[in-house]
Regions:
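Structural signal for the C-terminal ends of transmembrane alpha-helices
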Residues: 1, 38-48, 121-130
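Membrane-interface loop-to-helix entry segments
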Residues: 23-32, 105-117
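Interfacial segments of alpha-helical transmembrane regions
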Residues: 36-65
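A cytosolic-side transmembrane-helix exit/cap motif
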Residues: 48-55, 70-78
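Short, charged juxtamembrane terminal tails flanking transmembrane helices
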Residues: 135-140
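Aromatic-anchored segments of alpha-helical transmembrane domains
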Residues: 9-18, 56-66
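Transmembrane alpha-helical insertion/packing segments
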Residues: 1-31
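Extracytosolic (periplasmic/ER-lumenal) interhelical loops and adjacent juxtamembrane/interface segments
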Residues: 72-109
């Protein structure tokens, strides 16, 4: 039950990245993402990892939907499938991709950071629960 939103997210994201779905309509991509993350937040509001994951996704979807269906990114000059240049007319620029990543040459948004932290916490909680169950079964 807890993995359902993550699996749906991976499916939609994979369909976009690998098969090119939503390239002609990024607005629908971010609308689906918004609805998916909102659903995740409602179902799992007590789980801090999934809640942070959902809030990050909602932040990314909102800034993209408000700015015409594409995520504004600092430093680019052309419009790509889901990205557009950040300008003076960009709404909520603090939620756009502008944070320099320590890995490679990627730019991150505040929502991306929440997504990563949320997934990390969710996995740590899951592994801790697995370890606890295993420890109880073999009586360490």
């Amino acid at each position: 039950k807890k993995l359902t939103p993550l699996l749906l997210y991976a499916t939609v994201e994979g369909a976009h990245r690998f098969f090119g779905f939503f390239d002609t309509s990024p607005f629908s991509f971010f609308l689906i993402m918004f609805l998916l993350f909102f659903w995740c937040l409602i179902l799992h509001y007590k789980n801090i990892g999934l809640s942070l994951f959902a809030c990050g996704g909602i932040a990314n979807a909102i800034v993209s939907l408000i700015n015409g269906g594409r995520m504004p990114m600092l430093g680019i000059t052309a419009v790509y499938s889901i990205y557009q240049p950040m300008t003076d007319k960009t709404i909520f620029p603090f939620l756009c991709d502008w944070i320099s990543s320590p890995f490679r040459h990627y730019l991150l948004s505040f929502g991306d950071i929440l997504l990563a932290v949320g997934i990390t916490i969710f996995l740590i909680q899951g592994l801790a629960g697995l370890w606890r169950n295993l420890k109880n079964k073999i009586k360490i």
